[in-house]
Curated annotation (Swiss-Prot):
The entry's keywords: Cytoplasm, Lyase, Pyruvate, Ubiquinone biosynthesis
Domain of life: Bacteria
A Gene Ontology BP annotation from the UniProt entry: ubiquinone biosynthetic process
Lineage: Bacteria, Pseudomonadati, Pseudomonadota, Betaproteobacteria, Rhodocyclales
E.C. no: 4.1.3.40
Major subcellular site: cytoplasm
Similarity field: Belongs to the UbiC family.
Native source organism of the sequence: Azoarcus sp. (strain BH72)
Record keyword Phosphoprotein present: no
Pfam family of the protein (one): Chor_lyase
Protein name stated in the entry: Probable chorismate pyruvate-lyase
Enzyme class, UniProt record, top EC level: lyase
InterPro entries: Chorismate--pyruvate_lyase, Chorismate_lyase_/UTRA_dom_sf
Entry keyword annotation includes Amino-acid biosynthesis: no
Length: 189
């Protein structure tokens, strides 16, 4: 699905142009947090933002929101052995801020969201989509700012996203793979 405003195209599978070592990261439907933890000695989450904010046009479209509708945003860096490996952005529309999602959101703190999502059997994940996100997308610049000069970004980042559903309500989770992800071993430690 092409989104002209940001230039990216979200695909069901990574194209052949995606780096071979990155494809399993883009397509594994299991917990990204668990996958990273199995490949590093120390794992951490650095919360960058957890507040109300505006959405990108493609986030609004995916969640069926009108222009100007706001949402709660959670932006974090996933850290493996002291290196940021993923910039993640979670979106919870204001109209979805009831019940289970709101309790989870308020209580998550600096814990990884993935651990909570995959531990609740009531939560269902919709299929993953992936895209190559470049400088035309605001989220690329959010990732760059989050790194605060700790690493140089390539001209585009591979990302994946999916919607999680709980009692008919949606939470969008997007994960942007930073260059250091390829420094993790292919196989678990």
């Amino acid at each position: 699905m092409q989104h002209p405003a940001s230039g990216e195209s979200w695909l069901a599978r990574p194209p052949r142009t995606a780096e071979r070592r990155l494809r399993p990261w883009l397509t594994d439907p299991a917990s990204l947090t668990a996958r990273i933890r199995m490949r590093c000695g120390m794992f951490g989450v650095r919360v960058l933002r957890q507040s109300a904010g505006a959405l990108t046009p493609d986030e609004r479209r995916l969640l069926g929101l009108r222009a100007g509708e706001r949402a709660l945003l959670r932006e974090v860096l996933l850290i493996a052995d002291g290196r940021p490996v993923v910039f993640a952005r979670s979106v919870l529309a204001q109209r979805e801020q009831r019940g289970g999602w709101l309790r989870l959101w308020r209580g998550i703190g600096s814990r990884p969201l993935g651990a909570a999502l995959f531990s609740d059997p009531r939560i269902r994940r919709q299929p993953l989509a992936c895209a190559r996100i470049g400088a035309a997308d605001a989220r690329y610049h959010l990732a760059r700012r989050a790194l605060a000069g700790a690493a140089t970004l390539p001209p585009a980042l591979w990302a994946r996203r999916s919607v999680f559903r709980l009692h008919g309500r949606s939470l969008l989770v997007s994960e942007f793979f930073l260059p250091a992800i390829l420094g993790l071993p292919d196989d678990p430690l």
